[in-house]
């Protein structure tokens, strides 16, 4: 279909434009064919393989620690990251367990109980147009409610608005469940918080608020937009993508929402936040498990399914992602913990002089940065506070 459209446009184009379009199309198709052939040959040569990690590959012993350094911007070793992930899973699971028991769900693993709770009809939207409209209305209400509270947390706020949008139905099956899109650099296009509504059953009502705060405000939209709108910074600093900083901030934003009581009217909304945190902690365990500890795909999938409670199909997709993108999934929780640590350290040093709004402005005004640089920024801010 795409090829036909391009050919039709080429036919309508004149002269040089027609040649350029045909050449580009031909090169693209040829590249796809070459790639498919190489992948087929590689698969045939390797055969069925259950070893998912990179460590056992040539150069993998040196490569994975470099991946971890790049994705987390820390000097944490794979063994240290694995231990941290396990400790976080234990801590977060205990907190989630208490909330689940308060709902009368006492038997089974935490992940299994969260899955059962997420299937209860009282928490689900109808999987039809009316249900989707209700879900979008709830998301808009969540964004509006938290925006009214932002002045309590920040002195500088984004000028560019954020809109809640449904992922276009034509791409839902291959799209992420939820994601943020920044506005334009000149501020003429708003930012967007996209939600995948292919099946509303994946969105129990208690799981949505934390996603909203992660993707919109005070999460991705706020952080990325403030970087774009900052005065006196270079284009590089406005647009630099540092995984642990960006994703760590978004998890920290979920925590900020909790601190100002955004989950109070929906007590299980806090369970949604804990599930989000647990999910990211499990990612560290699974990623380092496969790429450093020699875990098989099956062991990684079983651990993730049992601990978080994701459906097996969703787990398999996640495992595929971690296999081809070593250490990327470790950046989320490691980044979050660093924001928490630096804030606690600043509070301890400044005491009554600590101002949360000024702290947030200090860590955000320079755009995304390596966590080691962030630590120096906070130290300088504390020194001058």
Label the model's feature ranges.
Residues 1-385:
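N-terminal maturation segment of proteins
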């Amino acid at each position: 279909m795409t090829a036909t459209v391009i050919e039709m446009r080429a036919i309508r184009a004149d002269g040089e434009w027609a040649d350029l379009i045909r050449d580009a199309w031909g090169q693209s198709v040829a590249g796809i064919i070459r790639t498919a052939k190489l992948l087929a040959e590689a698969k045939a040569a390797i055969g069925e393989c259950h070893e998912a990690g990179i460590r056992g590959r040539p150069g993998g012993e040196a490569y994975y620690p470099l991946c971890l350094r790049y994705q987390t911007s820390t000097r944490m070793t794979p063994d240290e990251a694995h231990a941290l992930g396990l400790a976080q899973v234990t801590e977060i699971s205990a907190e989630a367990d208490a909330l689940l028991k308060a709902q009368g769900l006492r038997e089974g693993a935490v992940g299994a109980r969260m899955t059962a709770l997420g299937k209860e009809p009282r928490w689900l939207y109808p999987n039809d147009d009316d249900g989707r409209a209700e879900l979008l209305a709830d998301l808009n209400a969540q964004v509006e409610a938290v925006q009214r509270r932002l002045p309590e947390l920040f002195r500088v706020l984004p000028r560019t608005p954020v809109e809640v949008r449904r992922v276009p139905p034509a791409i839902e099956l291959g799209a992420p469940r939820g994601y943020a899109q920044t506005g334009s650099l000149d501020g003429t296009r708003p930012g967007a918080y996209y939600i995948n509504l292919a099946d509303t059953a994946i969105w129990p009502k208690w799981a949505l608020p934390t996603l909203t705060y992660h993707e919109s405000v005070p999460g991705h939209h706020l952080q990325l937009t403030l970087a774009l709108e900052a005065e006196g910074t270079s284009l590089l600093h406005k647009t630099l993508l540092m995984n642990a900083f960006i994703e760590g901030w978004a998890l920290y934003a979920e925590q900020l929402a909790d601190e100002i009581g955004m989950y109070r009217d929906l007590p299980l909304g806090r369970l949604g936040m804990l599930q989000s945190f647990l999910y990211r902690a499990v990612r560290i365990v699974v990623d380092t498990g496969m790429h450093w500890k020699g875990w098989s795909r099956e062991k990684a999938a079983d651990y993730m399914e049992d601990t978080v409670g994701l459906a097996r199909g969703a787990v398999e997709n996640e495992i595929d992602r971690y296999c081809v993108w070593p250490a990327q999934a470790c950046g989320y929780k490691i980044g979050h913990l660093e924001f928490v640590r630096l804030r606690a350290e600043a509070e301890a040093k400044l005491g009554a002089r600590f101002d949360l709004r000024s702290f947030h402005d200090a860590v955000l005004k320079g755009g995304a940065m390596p966590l080691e640089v962030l630590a120096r920024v906070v130290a300088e801010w504390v020194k001058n506070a």
